[in-house]
């Protein structure tokens, strides 16, 4: 939820700042995209994207669009509240949490970023809010 997301990001930023370690911010949908893409009838390496969606009680459906090419995830549309009735095409997957697999992917992505010379500063890691806790802003 909203509060849990804020607390988790603040805790990660504080630990990275105080320990002087890099921090890589990746959305949970982007982490699961490579794993979930394997469930598609045809791998979307052709350039066509796919959607990951999650129903939020009393809020609607949150969705993000992704493309995976040789294991590299490209976020086409970040997770956001979808307009009711919006057509997403045929490649739509329900979000499926696998914390262990997604944490391993996050650590591998951080390691790859550091090998490539990226600094991964904690200051750039901010939460995303696909829905506003107070309504439209």
Model-found features: residue ranges?
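A short acidic, glycine/proline-enriched capping/turn motif at secondary-structure boundaries
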Residues: 1-2, 31
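DPxDG-like acidic metal-binding loop motif
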Residues: 2-21
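Oxyanion-binding and handling regions
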Residues: 24-137
């Amino acid at each position: 939820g909203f509060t849990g997301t804020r607390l988790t990001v603040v805790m990660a930023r504080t630990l990275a700042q105080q320990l002087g370690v890099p921090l890589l911010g990746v959305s949970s949908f982007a982490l699961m995209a490579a794993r979930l893409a394997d469930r598609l009838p045809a791998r979307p390496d052709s350039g066509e994207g796919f959607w990951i969606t999650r129903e939020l009680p009393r809020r609607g459906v949150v969705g993000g669009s992704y493309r995976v090419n040789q294991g590299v995830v490209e976020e086409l549309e970040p997770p956001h509240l979808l307009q009711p009735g919006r057509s997403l095409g045929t490649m739509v997957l329900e979000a499926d949490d696998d914390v262990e697999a997604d944490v391993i992917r996050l650590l591998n992505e951080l390691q790859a970023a550091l090998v490539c010379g990226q600094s991964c500063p904690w200051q750039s890691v901010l939460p995303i809010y696909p829905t506003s806790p107070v309504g439209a802003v």
